[in-house]
Amino acid sequence: MIDQIIDEVTDSDPYQELLVTADGVAEGTLGVRLDKWLAEQLPELSRSRCQKLIESGQVQRNGLVCQDKNLILKTGDRLVVNIPELIPLDVVAQNIPLDILYEDEQLIIINKPAGLVVHPGPGHPDGTVVNALLAHCPDLAGIGGVQRPGIVHRLDKDTTGAMVVAKTELALHNLQVQLKEKTARRLYWGIVYGSPKEIQGTVNLPVGRHPGDRQKMGIVPVEKGGREAVTHWRLLERIGNHSWLEFQLETGRTHQIRVHSKQMGHPLVGDNLYTSPGSVNVNLPGQALHAHQLSLIHPVSGEIITAIAPMPAHFEKLLVYLRQRIP
């Protein structure tokens, strides 16, 4: 069992001193990485924040600055961690309406509309979910210490539905772990071209940046930079030459459902990036993909929180139109 000693000179002192000790562990290596140990001992900080502190020279080991996050700690190591105040983000708060599905002091779950980018970036300096959240939750500016405060996972610009955002460092770290350990449950609805032969299945193929088009993702071998990607799917309804599917994400790679559905031979309707444009006589904002349910464990209470995002109007209109076309 690893214990810790934390000495704080004053409540406002940014330095924390930690002594690595162990009960029943012989003198020598503990086999624990520095960044992992810090994140465990300082649960109010996310692991990425701990890594940034290490890389920026804010951690000393036995009196010497240590910038190696992979360092293996040993019994008796004394760590001094400087946790400076976070620099305010250069992102303006904007009064953009939010459809809130759930909110408390730890987290907020919103129903993201189509056309809204999650965070500022090239081509989208403002008018994003982050800008809206900063107006709704001013304290969010310091969470994570990056340009994406509190963002646990993302939805593509034209994907609608449930998305959780952390309001504290503790919640950010906890929710990131839930996604990594697959204890959070994310269900999506999608309308695709064609009709799969089976009624359910799993696509387990690595996803990475498309070698010929940097705007796209594709099936890329792990040895060439692809990352594990697993998508479970089941058929909800066959509608003529189209199908309504439910997808469950086991991993959360960029464009994962869009890439995997195309690989199945059933690309999403309206996804002009991954398939040739097709006319369905319904004004779609983009791909017909909706994150309709998000379930997670509350970071503090331990209760199961389930948020349901209602079907958006354009999605419902598409279903009605396709059903009417059936002879």
Swiss-Prot record:
Pfam families: PseudoU_synth_2, S4. Keywords: Isomerase, RNA-binding. InterPro entries: PsdUridine_synth_cat_dom_sf, PsdUridine_synth_RluA-like_CS, PsdUridine_synth_RluC/D, PsdUridine_synth_RsuA/RluA, RluA_PseudoU_synthase, S4_RNA-bd, S4_RNA-bd_sf. It catalyses: a uridine in RNA = a pseudouridine in RNA. Residues 32-105 form the S4 RNA-binding domain. GO terms for molecular function: pseudouridine synthase activity; RNA binding; rRNA pseudouridine synthase activity. Gene3D superfamilies: Pseudouridine synthase, RNA-binding S4 domain. The keyword Heme does not apply. This is Uncharacterized RNA pseudouridine synthase slr1629. It comes from Synechocystis sp. (strain ATCC 27184 / PCC 6803 / Kazusa).
